[in-house]
UniProtKB/Swiss-Prot annotation:
One of its GO terms (cellular component) is cell division site. It is a multi-pass membrane protein. Belongs to the major facilitator superfamily. Allantoate permease family. This is Uncharacterized transporter C417.10. Keywords: Endoplasmic reticulum, Golgi apparatus, Membrane, Transmembrane, Transmembrane helix, Transport. One of its GO terms (biological process) is dipeptide transmembrane transport. InterPro entries: MFS (IPR011701), MFS_trans_sf (IPR036259). It comes from Schizosaccharomyces pombe (strain 972 / ATCC 24843). GO terms for molecular function: dipeptide transmembrane transporter activity; transmembrane transporter activity. The chain crosses the membrane at residues 65-87, 104-124, 136-156, 160-180, 192-212, 224-244, 292-312, 333-353, 357-377, 384-404, 416-436, 450-470. It is found in: Endoplasmic reticulum; Golgi apparatus; Membrane.
Length: 508
């Protein structure tokens, strides 16, 4: 029986086609080498779970962990929208911003995010997940409270630090989703917790509108927005610590039997729930996997428009559509409702359309139509409708989050793929605000045209990723039919990558 070493496979991932019998040498099966669920898996049989028992277990998870995830994602998005509201509530005047200075306030946040994304993800892998998320969120809340500064350099410095602290949120939630849910359940759950960005925008609009109308405040309204958001973030940090366990085997709300059922459910994912040790070979494999770079390019292209519209939406509505400050703040309500309702509807659509790349294409086409209306439509109401259509653009990012959860196997590989995707997210959001030049105000036509081009280019990446995964699944099915793949009991809990575990199939 021949064996394929990791080094050989990294040199030529397709080399497995030339082997008579495929039995991957997984090497380290010590406690450091295997998944956290491995010991539980040894005591768990392969019998099917009773459907009613499984529904009861999923309800427990949905009612305990999932609401906290949704609320945290809601509050962390408030920071992004707060900057957009603050700029029309006196931020630029108070901090004496001129030219591109406001653009840099958006770029600075994602610069910090970019710099700290990989260290944050390593910390999430190395240390207990919920406790690490708690620390990041509490520090982020304190920094947010301090954002009510009196000068521009201090504001920019805090924006960088805020980006560094927020860099743990998305990768942490991707890992949590993979820890608790089957692949068939991940798309809907990811859609819902990302949709709470929309609820964050609704809350932010209401808060900003209420503060803008008040004339007797102890300080400027834009400063109070940051302080309120910071206090909420600190509170939710401690809620995570109290409610969310580090992994299913430490879950206070599950019985011992329920914990074993979690392991049995996750067998279908062909991957485990976590390993605290960084594995260099999995990192190398990630860097040589073409899927990583297709997703990276997709992320950059998707988020150039996101970075621009997230920072400049209020200025666009006020400057080109003829609304005053209070009306502009209220326009955030329907925008948030479109995002919240649209993304949840998109999540339920995934129950009927099982090809994830098709879902990503649909939402990006809607965003492309919205960007065209924003760029080329004359009437202000048509432009506003285009802006609201852009609110469903995170649907494609949701698909990619779910793809990372379900298709990147091996804990170090999953973390690394998530990091590279989010680095692309940062790069796009760094570039986005810089496309809005002060000289182009108030229409910002070059920036709007850039949005159209980016969404159009993104549509090329989805069929490319689909084809790569479809081709590999077809090849593995052929090898299995020829009896060239040897099944390993509990292989899904040995912390194998998707290259190593040839029983693994990619979600399309």
């Amino acid at each position: 029986m021949s064996s394929i070493s990791i080094d050989e496979k990294l040199k030529d991932p397709e080399s497995v086609q030339n082997k008579e019998i495929l039995d991957v040498d997984v090497g380290d099966l010590s406690p450091k080498g295997v998944d956290a669920a491995f010991n539980y898996a040894l005591d768990v049989d392969y019998d099917e779970i009773d459907p009613e028992t499984e529904r009861r277990l999923v309800r427990k998870i949905d009612c305990t962990i999932f609401p906290v995830m949704c609320l945290v994602y809601c509050i962390q998005f408030l920071d992004k929208t707060s900057n957009s509201y603050a700029v029309i509530m006196g931020l630029k005047e108070d901090l004496k911003m001129e030219g591109q200075m406001y653009s840099w306030s958006g770029t600075a946040f994602y610069l910090g995010y970019l710099v700290f994304e990989f260290p944050a993800s390593l910390l999430l892998q190395r240390f207990p997940l919920s406790k690490t998320l708690c620390v990041f969120l509490v520090i982020w809340g304190f920094l947010l409270c301090m954002t009510s500064v009196a000068n521009y350099p201090g504001f920019i410095a805090l924006r960088v630090l805020l980006g560094m602290m927020e860099s743990a949120a998305s990768p942490g939630f991707i890992l949590l989703t993979a820890q608790w849910y089957k692949r068939s359940e991940q798309q809907l759950r990811t859609s819902v917790w990302v949709a709470f960005n929309g609820l964050g925008q609704i809350l932010g609009s209401c808060m900003a509108y209420g503060l803008a109308k008040r004339t007797s405040l102890p300080m400027r309204g834009w400063k109070l927005i940051f302080i309120i958001c910071g206090v909420l973030a600190i509170f939710l940090g401690f809620v995570i610590l109290a409610v969310v366990p580090d992994n299913p085997f430490k879950a206070w709300f599950l019985t011992e039997e329920d914990r074993k059922l979690v392991v049995k459910r996750l067998r279908a994912n062909k991957q485990g729930v976590g390993n605290n040790h960084f594995k260099l070979y999995q990192f190398k494999e990630t860097m040589l996997d073409i899927r990583t770079w297709i997703m990276f390019v997709s992320s950059v292209l998707l988020n150039i428009p996101n970075g621009g519209i997230g920072t400049f939406s209020s200025l666009l509505i006020k400057g080109t559509m003829g609304y005053d400050t209070l009306q502009t703040l209220l326009m955030g309500l329907p925008a948030g409702a479109c995002e919240f309702g649209g993304l949840i509807a998109f999540g339920f659509l995934s129950l009927f359309i099982h090809k994830r790349m098709v879902l990503a294409t649909i939402t990006t086409c809607i965003a492309l139509i919205g960007s065209c209306l924003l760029s080329f439509a004359g009437p202000p109401r048509a432009q506003l409708a285009g802006y609201y259509l852009l609110m469903v653009s995170p649907g494609a990012m949701i698909v990619m989050f779910a793809i990372i959860s379900s298709n990147a196997s091996g804990y170090t590989k999953k973390v690394t793929v998530g990091v590279i995707y989010l680095i692309g997210y940062c790069v796009g959001n760094l570039i986005g605000p810089q496309t809005f030049k002060a000289a182009d105000a108030p229409e910002y036509m070059p920036a709007k045209n850039t949005m159209v081009g980016c969404y159009a280019a993104t549509l090329v990446t989805f069929p490319a990723l689909y084809y790569v995964n479809w081709r590999e699944n077809k090849r593995r099915d052929q090898l299995a039919a020829e009896g060239k793949i040897e099944h390993r009991p509990n292989a899904e809990f040995e912390d194998l990558t998707d290259f190593e575990n040839l029983d693994f199939r990619y979600t399309l």
